[in-house]
């Protein structure tokens, strides 16, 4: 058998047995702003498992904090800590649900992430 064919067969077997493929979906981008609506878009809709990335193009520090992080009654699903100017924060994906969030430094900054079970749902920004 040709050595090239053996390598091709081995690679094919390795790819088939390698487990689930990583989600290579592009992240949905949300921008942090210093003025209203503060998070752009203010409400973002994505399919479950889709990565979400918040970018901070402002000259000010911000956070992205799930509202449940301020109570002990529910789990805190994401909290960026301080995101410096020019920085970003990414959540690899969330299960279906509604996730209100805010900036812990500037409480007037609020956003909503809506995650659907439908993988065919395009990111709605």
Predicted regions and their residues:
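Extracytoplasmic copper-binding redox domains, predominantly the cupredoxin/blue-copper superfamily
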Residues: 17-125
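Bacterial N-terminal signal peptides
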Residues: 7-16
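Bacterial N-terminal signal peptides that target proteins for export
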Residues: 1-7
């Amino acid at each position: 058998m040709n050595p090239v064919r053996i390598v091709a067969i081995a690679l094919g077997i390795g790819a088939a047995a390698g487990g689930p493929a990583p989600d290579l979906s592009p992240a949905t981008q949300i921008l942090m702003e210093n003025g209203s609506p503060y998070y752009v878009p203010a409400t973002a809709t994505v399919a479950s498992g889709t990565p979400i990335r918040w970018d901070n193009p402002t000259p000010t520090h911000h956070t992205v904090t799930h509202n449940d992080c301020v109570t002990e009654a529910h789990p805190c699903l994401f909290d960026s800590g301080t995101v410096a100017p020019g920085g970003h924060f990414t959540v690899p994906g969330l299960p279906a649900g509604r996730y209100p969030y805010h900036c812990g430094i500037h409480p007037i900054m609020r956003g909503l992430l809506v995650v659907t079970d439908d993988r065919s749902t395009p990111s709605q920004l």
